[in-house]
Amino acid sequence: MAEAPQVVEIDPDFEPLPRPRSCTWPLPRPEFSQSNSATSSPAPSGGAAANPDGAAGLPSASAAAVNADFMSNLSLLEESGDFQQAPGSVAAAAPLSQHPPVPPAAAAAAAGGQLAGQPRKSSSSRRNAWGNLSYADLITKAIESSAEKRLTLSQIYEWMVKSVPYFKDKGDSNSSAGWKNSIRHNLSLHSKFIRVQNEGTGKSSWWMLNPEGGKSGKSPRRRAASMDNNSKFAKSRGRAAKKKASLQSGQEGAGDSPGSQFSKWPASPGSHSNDDFDNWSTFRPRTSSNASTISGRLSPIMTEQDDLGDGDVHSMVYPPSAAKMASTLPSLSEISNPENMENLLDNLNLLSSPTSLTVSTQSSPGTMMQQTPCYSFAPPNTSLNSPTPNYQKYTYGQSSMSPLPQMPMQTLQDNKSSYGGMSQYCAPGLLKELLTSDSPPHNDIMTPVDPGVAQANSRVLGQSVLMGPNSVMPAYGGQASHNKMMTPSSHTHPGHAQSTSAVNGRALPHAVNTMPHTSGMNRLAPVKTALQVPLAHPMQMSALGGYSSVSSCNGYGRMGVLHQEKLPSDLDGMFIERLDCDMESIIRNDLMDGDTLDFNFDNVLPNQSFPHSVKTTTHSWVSG
């Protein structure tokens, strides 16, 4: 049964015929065959090689011939004979084993391995479809073939189409896109090709061979000029390095040169050893600028005081507790002692008018904190039987402070004597009280004004200045347009004012409420409130606080002699000092030195202070 398959022959349509390698690249060429075939087609060459062997028209003759084209050092007869028996055995196995696909597949794999393996093995010597020459070699031949040893890109394309058979039918735009792109790529890739600018306008550059003989193989791609690979920057870095070395050598001889002081600084670029800062040595480093953080502080905003702790900063603006206030104002326990409280009670008995001012009393610093952040104290150098000043009704304004001459105050009076002084420092409230007032105008006046702008580097406690008869009061600054002309027949008794403390560069507005009275009488006139004059410029403030004074119409100037009247018995022993100053020099020297500052005030009605209604003037200062 093993002999039967040799007689049976398979149909020629089913024999494993070799397929031309048209679908693969590169195509088989006649020069690859080591046989004696001279034809370009594999099938005819196979037939010509098989016929002389006497192999009579066997069905597998063409397959053996194709195999012979790719065989080396093997006899064509052996190959043809072996291949003739293979189909016979395959055909015999088909009807017997009932597994025809397996043996033919194995045979086809063997034949395919011979067909596919051999060409790849032999094609290793052929780099491209047109031969062993690369694109770079073809470009080199094209340039060398020209008379001037230079070609434009279009001339290189033309030479390729004319000289290389592979590109003869690929000169049109559709089929030339690929290889033309490869040529451009190789021209840019290899350093052996250099581009020379064409002299003519509108013409492409010349491509020439590098006379220095650049690398023909793959070299690092030439990228666009940058600081890393541009020769100009490399040269500049070299010059900078040399210059730096020369500067350093020169610095040793002359240590006071400008370059030496830059390089000696720790933050100077010249002090760094990194090469990235080489170029900086020729420039003026920004660290030498007086605006640098290394140099002195140039900010127009004044720095915060170093001696102010966190608790001292806002203690006067927002007193957290009585204990905190006592720590902020060390003399608070002294000025609010029981003696002052008794004086306050005695003085309250004098207030017989229905519109009298009721001042809340506190017996100890611990109870001085009211619902609103207010506090009361009287200067320790006074022995007045006047009410302890209740520092309410005015919110603190904010500004920077520095030790200045004087803080002015103005007192609005209507031909009535004023007695005592009441400075009010407080948070919210006067605006609402003025707006809701239902009493006739001109009875009581509560007119808040802008704060006096002061600058002080140290906190100064308020000091009272006693102004008696024949005392001339300086008043300067501007006031609202509805200021009244004050009569010189009125006089002011101690006007207590407090200079503000430096709190984060913020100024505190001052307001003075004066309680007028008639000497020798047991009743007091309705309360008149004196207010502070707004300062348009920062004023220098000495240890003395503001002065309560009678204002002239223009807001500043020398005041006339005040009305002379006998002081109360408790004030006869007080020290009275005549205050006089040159207003013109103060205005020129002090007021004009500063810059105007804008302030906004939000006055709100406090919970405890002035139970009686406060009346406004007919020309209310409150804006709608």
From Swiss-Prot:
GO (cellular component) term, any one: nucleus
DNA-binding region(s), residue ranges: 130-224
Entry comment on modification after translation: Phosphorylation by NLK promotes nuclear export and inhibits the transcriptional activity. In response to growth factors, phosphorylation on Thr-24, Ser-226 and Ser-292 by PKB/AKT1 promotes nuclear export and inactivation of transactivational activity. Phosphorylation on Thr-24 is required for binding 14-3-3 proteins. Phosphorylation of Ser-226 decreases DNA-binding activity and promotes the phosphorylation of Thr-24 and Ser-289, permitting phosphorylation of Ser-292 and Ser-295, probably by CDK1, leading to nuclear exclusion and loss of function.
The keyword 4Fe-4S belongs to this UniProt entry's keyword annotation: no
GO MF entry, a single one: DNA-binding transcription activator activity, RNA polymerase II-specific
Site (DNA-binding): 128, 135, 195
Region (Sufficient for interaction with NLK): 253-532
N6-acetyllysine modifications at: 215, 218, 232, 235, 244, 393
Annotated positions of the Phosphothreonine modification: 24, 303
Recorded superkingdom: Eukaryota
Alphabetical UniProt keywords: Acetylation, Activator, Apoptosis, Autophagy, Cytoplasm, Differentiation, DNA-binding, Methylation, Nucleus, Phosphoprotein, Transcription, Transcription regulation, Ubl conjugation
Main location: cytoplasm
Presence of keyword Cytoplasm: yes
CDD domains assigned: FH_FOXO1
Compositional bias (Low complexity): 37-62, 105-119
Protein name: Forkhead box protein O1
Organism: Bos taurus
Higher taxonomy: Eukaryota, Metazoa, Chordata, Craniata, Vertebrata
GN (gene name): FOXO1
